[in-house]
Design a protein with these regions (language model features):
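Bacterial N-terminal signal peptides that target proteins for export
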Residues: 1-8
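Bacterial N-terminal signal peptides
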Residues: 9-17
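C-terminal and inter-domain tail/linker signature
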Residues: 21-183
């Protein structure tokens, strides 16, 4: 009986330790997303393209491959509502994210679905604020060394095999708080 109690105590301590070391609710939600529901073949193909986009192209900065998922004249609607047009501008904007957090990655899409010409995915974007963040006019925010893990979502409208409009969503206030420069 004592041996069973010892084993149960060890398991409980291990579980508490793992939970205490969990980085953020975004990475370790209390209630995980349900299992992926199979979509139509055309939607599944677009979702695979989305996975490749985030997990490989974005996370490894393979900008020469962005055309595999983005049209040349793509419109991007950013979390703050501003829009940009064109794949070259989008690449420049994406590169800017890696200036202050060179280790940014997206490695999971817990929710993936689509209908017709639209797809939607959620993800977790992680990184560490390790180099100065340019804020314009030659000014910078100095790095805090803090890690971030943001819940994000992307809605894509597809024309053929590429997106012609992409809507990006994440909480900028939460991001600034996580990197130690916001309230």
């Amino acid at each position: 009986m004592n041996k069973v109690r010892s084993i149960l105590a060890a398991v409980a301590i291990a579980a508490i330790t793992i939970a205490a070391n969990a980085d953020t609710p975004a990475e370790n939600p209390l209630t995980p997303a349900p299992k992926h529901e199979r979509q139509s073949p055309s939607i599944e193909q677009k979702l695979r393209t989305f996975d490749t986009l985030d997990f490989d192209v974005f996370s490894n900065q393979k900008w020469e491959r962005l055309h595999e998922s983005h049209a040349k004249d793509i419109v991007i609607t950013w979390p703050d509502g501003h829009e940009t047009k064109g794949i070259d501008k989008h690449i420049d904007d994406l590169k800017a994210l890696f200036v202050f957090a060179p280790d940014i990655q997206i490695k999971t899409h817990p929710i993936r679905f689509g209908s017709g010409t639209f797809t939607g995915v959620t993800g977790v974007m992680t990184g560490t604020f390790t180099t100065p963040m340019p804020v314009g006019e030659g000014k910078f925010i100095q790095p805090t060394g803090k890690r971030f893990a943001l819940s994000m979502a992307t809605i894509g409208h597809w024309s053929g095999k590429t997106m012609d409009h992409e809507w990006l969503f994440w909480d900028n206030q939460d991001f600034m708080k996580q990197i130690g420069v916001g309230q």
